[in-house]
Amino acid sequence: MVDERVKNRVEPAAMSPLQVRDILADPQGQNQQEDPLFLAVHTSPQTVYPDFLEFPLPLVSDRMKSLLEKYMPGLEWRAVILTDFKQAKQDVYWLLRPPMEDCLSAQTEWYPNQTLKRLVLRQGALESPVFRIKGSIEPHIYIHLAVAESLLRRFFTGIRLQRVEMEA
């Protein structure tokens, strides 16, 4: 989740939900190197470039990518170039596209608009240490406890962790 404590974070230009869905689509089976994605950013002299940006796309810094690759060596990455045209500056981030896991418990509760009210995950259904939830319209990234502890030991910026309920 986004860390609201990071003030003046860099903000990529807005994207439509359709664009986001297409970019996040699973690239497996395409056997081709994807071209970098260029996103314009809005900055000020106080702008901060955190290690994790959640919106409009889940983006990670080089440093965070290196750590996540240790837990998921087969994960495919796509370079995203954040471009500030006013200051003629570019920064490289990486699009995080973890696999979708079918791990929702029957105990999960939903609001009428299909957003999560109470999230409960099935204990044995988690294969990947970093994943998204199949069947959820919310864009959050989920991680195993070992990954969370590793991230916290290295003082990454821009992330906020929240415990998720597991099925008993």
Residue ranges and their predicted role:
Residues M1-A168:
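Phosphate/anion-contacting hairpin/loop surfaces
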